[in-house]
A protein has these predicted regions:
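Acidic, Mg2+-coordinating catalytic modules of nucleic-acid enzymes
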Residues: 1, 22, 99-100, 106-116, ...
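Switch/communication elements of ASCE P-loop NTPase nucleotide-binding domains
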Residues: 1-64, 70, 263-412
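A structural detector for beta-sheet-dominated domains
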Residues: 9, 20-22, 67, 76-78, ...
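ABC nucleotide-binding domain signature
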Residues: 29, 116-117
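Globular "head" domains of long coiled-coil molecular machines
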Residues: 68-69, 125
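Conserved nucleotide-sensing/catalytic segment adjacent to the nucleotide-binding pocket
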Residues: 70-94, 401, 407-408
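Short linear interaction motifs
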Residues: 87-108, 305
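Extended helical coiled-coil dimerization/tether regions that scaffold
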Residues: 158, 165-305, 311-323
Length: 481
């Protein structure tokens, strides 16, 4: 799906806020100071689409236009007037008609195939928004559905291990190479019966499950080394036996291949088992590339987990027509990964996914936007108690990080640190003073020059724009210009 226009008239500090999306390129980034509503915008969009899914609009006014599955959709919601109108391809649709089509994924719905969310801060706010969907998803699982894929995927750090297992199972090695991961060792999945299991009534292998979960349990049972072993200590329920499946990565890949034929993936299956409280725990060691050293997944850095949750999660979500909402997915990344982030996204999403989906990133990182066009960036700022989201004048691409920092994007007075900049400003004030310097001022100027001489290479080569400015200022004062 492609977002085209959104107007929000009153969600938290988003008062009369409008964004017009003028490019089909991904990602779209939102930058701005703290308090300019970047995270609130992500939440508001999530509220809108959860509301559309259930036919129950959120308690704020909005107007949205987007395209999905070859349809043009426009929705207006007014809390004050009590009006909620939906048009599809210019024709008004009843709420029942729209809701019916949205909930029927096989009918090319006027809705994203999937909404993928990553939120770097406290997750409670996002979890509360999708709480109703989580209940619906659990109901679907309990009713033995064959379709176990989530419409709203909320990826967070706690799921990094499932995503890593999924990447191995489906042979997506590009991100693993970046993370220095060669393979996994000693994979164990600890499972227990669902609450609905009755020992005297249900079969002991599949625990009375049906649909996609039963098929997946059969896949595990057939692939596991020596099938399975009882392991009661992993069970949280003393009256229900647990079991452990031990699966080598070769057999894990075979499970992945079987799931792919059914249009599923291991990540979504593990999510389904966890939702049914069948998956108790997973264990494995990571084999480091090159050295073959083993280490536990808990040893992964926060940045590595963040990459797994976003880039890895998107790699496994093979749907087209998606809405991807990422709130500060770069908080723990080193500069090298931030610099490569746009290409990592391209690596995760197929060309068709990029063409038919919208990815929105809220960020503070100048490196993240350094390779984008101006149409891919919104600058959030406050104006008369309103939040304005406007497009920049120049492309960030080609400017370099130092110039981006001092440009309209971030507006810093200098790309140098504050103390060095203060020394430069003081030197300029003394050097260009019209009156003769006092002995004390001359001594201070010499002291500053000595300090700056030590940093000479840093100033000359890391901030050439400032050096050029300083030389120009000297030339003007000397009458050479």
């Amino acid at each position: 799906m492609k977002l085209e226009y959104i107007h929000i008239a009153g969600y938290k500090n988003l008062i009369d806020t409008t964004l017009v999306f003028e490019t089909s390129e991904n990602p779209i980034t939102i930058i701005g100071n703290n308090g300019t509503g970047k995270s609130n915008l992500i939440e508001a969009l999530l509220h809108v689409f959860v509301g559309l899914y259930y036919g129950k609009p959120p308690e704020f006014d909005y107007h949205i236009r987007y395209a999905a599955h070859n349809k043009q959709i426009e929705v207006r919601n007014s809390v004050h007037d009590g009006s909620y109108t939906v048009t599809v391809d210019g024709m008004p649709w009843s709420h029942a008609q729209f809701n019916r089509r949205v909930r029927s994924p096989q009918q090319m719905p006027p809705f994203p195939s999937q909404v993928f969310i990553y939120y770097s801060g406290t997750c409670d706010r996002v979890e509360n928004i999708v709480k109703k969907y989580n209940r619906s998803y659990l109901y679907k699982l309990k009713n033995q559905s064959d379709d176990l894929e989530r419409q709203f995927v909320f990826s967070d750090i706690s799921q990094a291990e499932w995503i890593l297992l999924g990447l191995i199972a489906h042979r997506h090695h590009a991100l693993l190479i970046d993370l220095g991961i060669d393979d996994l060792h000693g994979v164990k999945l600890m499972l227990q019966p669902p609450e609905s299991y009755v020992r005297d009534r249900d079969d002991p292998i599949y625990w009375g499950t049906e649909g996609g979960i039963r098929e997946f349990l059969a896949d595990l049972h057939n692939a596991a080394d020596e099938n399975y072993e009882p392991f009661a200590k992993y069970s949280g329920r003393s009256n229900r036996e647990a079991r452990v499946y031990r699966i080598g990565t070769v057999k894990l890949e075979k499970v992945g291949a079987v799931l792919e034929k059914r249009g599923a993936n291991l990540y979504s299956m593990l999510q389904a088992l966890a939702a049914r409280q069948i998956l108790v725990k997973n264990e494995f060691d990571i084999i480091q590339k090159g050295s073959r050293n083993h280490y536990r997944p808990e040893s992964l850095s926060e940045g590595e987990k963040q990459l797994l949750c976003v880039i890895g999660g998107l790699t496994l979500a093979q749907n087209t027509e998606c809405l991807v909402l990422l709130d500060e997915p770069d908080t723990h990344l080193n500069p090298a990964w931030s610099w490569r982030y746009n290409n990592l996204l391209k690596q995760a999403l197929t060309s068709q996914q990029r063409t038919t989906s919208t990815t929105i990133i809220a960020t503070h990182d100048p490196i993240m936007i350094s390779g984008l066009t101006k149409e891919q960036v919104f600058i959030a700022r406050k104006e008369n108690e309103r939040l304005i989201y406007e497009s920049p004048v120049r492309d960030p691409r080609g400017q370099g990080v130092a110039n981006i920092l001092v440009s309209e994007y971030f507006g810093l007075p200098s790309s140098l640190d504050e103390n060095t900049q203060m020394l430069l400003d003081e030197r300029l004030q003394l050097a260009y003073k019209k009156e003769r310097l006092t002995d004390e001022e001359s001594a201070r100027l010499s002291e500053i020059n000595n300090q700056l001489d030590i940093l000479g290479l840093s100033i000359s080569f890391r901030d050439p724009a400032y050096k050029e400015f300083e030389e120009q200022k000297f030339a003007v004062l000397e009458g050479r210009v």
